[in-house]
Amino acid sequence: MEIENVLLAEAAVADIRGAMTLVGYNQRVVNSPNLPFSFKQTLIITLRGEAEAGSHAQLSVNLNSPEGDSAFAFAQQVPIPPPASKDVPSFINIAMDIPFSGNSYGTYSLKVTWREMGQESQGRDIDIFVLDPAAATPAAG
């Protein structure tokens, strides 16, 4: 299976078909008037492709601060479901709330890694920008 999308949102809801509704999609700029700060984001990972039904893969999520320190780390085995039909590839939608807290302003890096047994790992990175609204200057335009 391959990572198709890695998204951030304020919230996500899935229906019985697996379709997802996202609220506040692409919340990558955070204005925090105080330090330390804390809030939650919903991480959505969409995987697609062929895989051996009944097997497992390793999902890892790491959030690093602007200084390179680990602010959050998570790893879990994920079961791979069988495809809905022999003519349809497998799809997996994973939505999880992740805590987001820090002690500094700057660019935080969120890395998602997916690894199936016998396969090379693959990853996606998302930058999240934490700004002090008092220090922000409007862009020239």
Placement of each model-derived feature along the sequence:
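Contiguous segments within soluble domain cores/interaction surfaces
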Residues: I3-G141
